[in-house]
UniProtKB/Swiss-Prot annotation:
PROSITE patterns: FIBRINOGEN_C_1, FIBRINOGEN_C_2. It comes from Rattus norvegicus (Rat). InterPro entries: FIB_ANG-like, Fibrinogen-like_C, Fibrinogen_a/b/g_C_1, Fibrinogen_a/b/g_C_dom, Fibrinogen_CS. SUPFAM superfamilies: Fibrinogen C-terminal domain-like (SSF56496). GO terms for molecular function: identical protein binding. This is Fibrinogen-like protein 1. The gene is Fgl1.
Length: 314
């Protein structure tokens, strides 16, 4: 009888112990679920904070560049020379701004705005934004470059010499970002963009087109006008250096320097008008295949990067 009682007590103890183990396991699982939920909440908060910090850093960078001071250049410490903005991007510098670059055949560094958005690594060769710069200039100015190399939205022309030095390094893609006064945006992109040297009068060469703005540079939008509207293989002209195919002087009539033919279907260095315009002359900031000859665009950015560049799509 005593043995039976002992067996029963042992059995009851085992059953109670097993139940406590089960309860312990359930409590442990509940605690794990609770902790995991807390971790997810913390991760979400961290991501939200990271977004806020990134936005604040971007706003600070823009304010810094917009102050109009010469110290708005981003100093990389002079550790190495960069051939273009794509090399700067690949070296870990991801903020848009003014940097110093030195193409392979260049004798000296020069300043340029690097657009690290839109996949990164873009070297900006021209910008129109507000009409603050006069683009009706002579050969020397267009050859050497001019404009605002301080403010992030400043207007400038990088200079035909510098554009030649950049594009002779290899195959480059040209992307042109266009915006009208109704806040619509389009782009035109050309492969194998190249500008010749001074002996060729900085001749323009472009390859295959893609984009949403239409192909105004090659003149292929209508075969009947291509002979006079195409900018392909055109020499650069200014008011004091007439290299176009026109009997008159396109640069003088259009009040800008450009790769004129007889005269143009695109002129992104044209007269800046404070709003769209209709006039008998087509001397505005023109991209014919989007807004026609008599609409002057609000903003333009011409930027290039190596064709084999692998963009950041994050």
């Amino acid at each position: 009888m005593g043995e039976i009682r002992s067996f029963v007590l042992i059995t009851v103890a085992l059953i109670l112990g097993k139940e406590s183990w089960v309860l312990g396991d359930e409590n442990c699982l509940q605690e794990q679920v609770r902790l995991r939920a807390q971790v997810r909440q913390l991760e979400t908060r961290v991501k939200q904070q990271q977004v806020v910090i990134a936005q604040l850093l971007h706003e600070k960078e823009v304010q810094f560049l917009d102050r109009g001071q010469e110290d708005s250049f981003i100093d990389l410490g002079g550790k190495r020379h960069y051939a273009d903005c794509s090399e700067i991007y690949n070296d870990g510098f991801k903020h848009s701004g003014f940097y110093k670059i030195k193409p392979l055949q260049s004798l000296a560094e020069f300043s340029v705005y690097c657009d690290m958005s839109d996949g990164g690594g873009w070297t900006v060769i021209q910008r129109r934004s507000d009409g603050s710069e006069n683009f009706n200039r002579g050969w020397n100015d267009y050859e050497n470059g001019f404009g605002n190399f301080v403010q992030s939205n400043g207007e400038y022309w990088l200079g035909n010499k510098n554009i030649n030095l950049l594009t002779m390094q290899g195959d480059y893609t040209l992307k042109i970002d266009l915006t009208d006064f109704e806040k619509n945006s389009r782009f035109a992109q050309y492969e194998k963009f190249k500008v010749g040297d001074e002996k060729s009068f900085y001749e323009l060469n472009i390859g295959e087109y893609s984009g949403t703005a239409g192909d105004s540079l090659s003149g292929t939008f209508h075969p009947e006008v291509q002979w006079w509207a195409s900018h392909q293989t055109m020499k650069f002209s200014t008011r004091d250096r007439d290299n176009d195919n026109y009997n008159g002087n396109c640069a003088e009539e259009e009040q800008s320097g450009w790769w004129f033919n007889r005269c143009h279907s695109a002129n992104l260095n044209g007269v800046y008008y404070q709003g769209p315009y209709r006039a008998e002359t087509d001397n505005g900031v023109v991209w014919y295949t989007w807004r026609g000859w008599w609409y002057s665009l609000k903003s333009v950015v011409m930027k290039i990067r190596p064709s084999d560049f692998i963009p950041n799509i994050v």
